[in-house]
């Protein structure tokens, strides 16, 4: 889950991307972040020299003894991370999710897993990190949602539902046949039949992760809104997950297509 990036709606936003391979990552960094720029490096290029600490919230620090790490617990350990010399905390998925794929199956882009805390807890973490000269970025899963997301539940309810075109549907499995199956150990096709919708839906990853339709302007704009929401909260940037697969075209691998790069630019 994987590559390339979007420059968010923030001043002096910048993008860095790794080679277009299945395990590559990408960061969209908001250049106007309040954290200082160590060593006098240009603000927009801070990430090229930063020490990143990749962090799974549930495995880090538990503030209420329920056996699950949470944002208050993480915030209480910021002095330790500062002492380690961390420049930027990279948060693995924490949005609301049924957790069938470690949080990469999001059911609410604007929410936080209840066991981790609240949106206000995330805001407090970011503010306290900035006060210590550290930045915070988060994983942003753009290619697909959980099949439990209200968008998909609406989409499958009726061909006439406004959300129907937020996902990729077909009456046949014979579309985009040149696109490889990524999880060949669990998936036999990139298409899965939905009984309620009476149609196949497209997914490049697990069958419970339907792909969003980036040919739909409403989807493109809503995902920008999601990015803006977290930037407004104080996030300094994102690792954009699985972005090589945003667009599908017949006769291609449907990976790293020109339309994808144009959207992310």
Say what each PLM segment does.
Residues 2-224, 228, 232, 243-265:
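Acidic/aromatic-lined carbohydrate-recognition and catalytic surfaces
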């Amino acid at each position: 889950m994987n590559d390339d990036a979007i420059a968010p709606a923030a001043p002096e936003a910048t993008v860095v991307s790794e080679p277009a391979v299945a395990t590559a990552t990408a960061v969209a960094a908001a250049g106007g972040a309040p954290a200082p720029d160590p060593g006098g490096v240009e603000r927009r290029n801070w990430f090229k020299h930063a020490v990143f600490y990749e962090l799974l919230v549930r495995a880090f620090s538990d503030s209420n003894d329920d056996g699950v790490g949470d944002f208050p617990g993480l915030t209480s350990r910021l002095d330790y991370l500062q002492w380690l010399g961390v420049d930027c905390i990279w948060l693995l998925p924490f949005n609301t999710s049924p957790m069938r794929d470690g949080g990469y199956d999001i059911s609410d882009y604007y929410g936080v897993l209840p066991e981790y805390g609240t949106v206000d807890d995330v805001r407090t973490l970011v503010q306290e990190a900035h006060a210590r000269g550290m930045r915070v970025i988060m994983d942003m899963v753009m290619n697909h949602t959980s099949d439990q997301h209200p968008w998909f539940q609406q989409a499958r309810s009726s061909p006439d539902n406004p959300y129907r075109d937020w996902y990729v549907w077909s009456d046949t499995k014979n579309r985009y046949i040149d696109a490889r199956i990524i999880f060949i150990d669990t998936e036999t096709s990139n298409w899965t039949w939905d009984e309620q919708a009476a149609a196949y839906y497209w997914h490049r990853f697990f069958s419970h992760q339907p792909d969003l339709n980036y040919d739909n302007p409403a989807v493109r704009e809503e995902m920008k809104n999601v990015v803006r929401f977290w930037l407004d909260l104080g996030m300094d940037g994102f690792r954009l997950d699985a972005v090589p697969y945003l667009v599908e075209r017949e006769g291609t691998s449907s990976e790293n297509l020109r339309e994808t790069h144009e959207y992310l630019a």
